[in-house]
């Protein structure tokens, strides 16, 4: 997709959202089925079924997907798509890869130490870019990618998560 194609695809959406701001508000959904046979949750992604389970550092076998890895994968996917979209808009020639890593202290989630954080204490996202573009353009590309990456901004902003249940 080139810049003209991207603009053609996004133009009517941007115009509609300017005229009808409420049309831009969309609720995304995900759901999973609890596995009664093992400590796992089966998540339908729309493309495939992912079975998530315990990380080996919490007693899992490593045979199932780890939710923490899935969070980093979502960040990599979003940041990669955002970078490609921004690069296309800026008409920059950029290729490469995206890498994320995060630090966890599993004492927190296992309840071993109440002072230990439950969750990532730091996440690092890195782009390894192949490009002949000037550094100032790549700096701007990174700045705009960070600004418009939905998953990155959600993590950085610390959005509230409401836990609830219902019974049947």
Where are the regions that the model predicts?
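Extended beta-strand/beta-hairpin segments
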Residues: 1-73, 85-168
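Alpha-helical metal-binding/catalytic segments enriched in His/Glu/Asp
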Residues: 74-79
């Amino acid at each position: 997709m080139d810049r003209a194609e991207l603009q053609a695809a996004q133009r009517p959406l941007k115009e509609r959202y300017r005229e009808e701001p409420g049309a831009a508000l969309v609720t995304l959904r995900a759901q999973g089925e609890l596995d009664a046979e093992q400590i796992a949750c089966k998540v339908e992604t729309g493309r495939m079924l992912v079975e998530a389970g315990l990380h080996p550092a919490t007693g899992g076998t490593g045979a199932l997907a780890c939710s923490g890895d899935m969070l980093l994968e979502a960040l990599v996917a979003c940041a990669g798509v955002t970078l490609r979209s921004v690069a296309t808009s800026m008409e920059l020639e950029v290729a490469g890869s995206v890498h994320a890593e995060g630090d966890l202290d599993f004492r927190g989630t296992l309840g071993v130490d109440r002072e230990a954080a439950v969750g990532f204490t730091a996440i690092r996202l890195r782009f390894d870019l192949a490009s002949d573009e000037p550094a100032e353009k790549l700096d701007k590309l990174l700045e705009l990618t960070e600004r418009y990456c939905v998953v990155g901004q959600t993590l950085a902003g610390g959005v509230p998560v409401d836990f609830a249940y219902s019974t049947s």
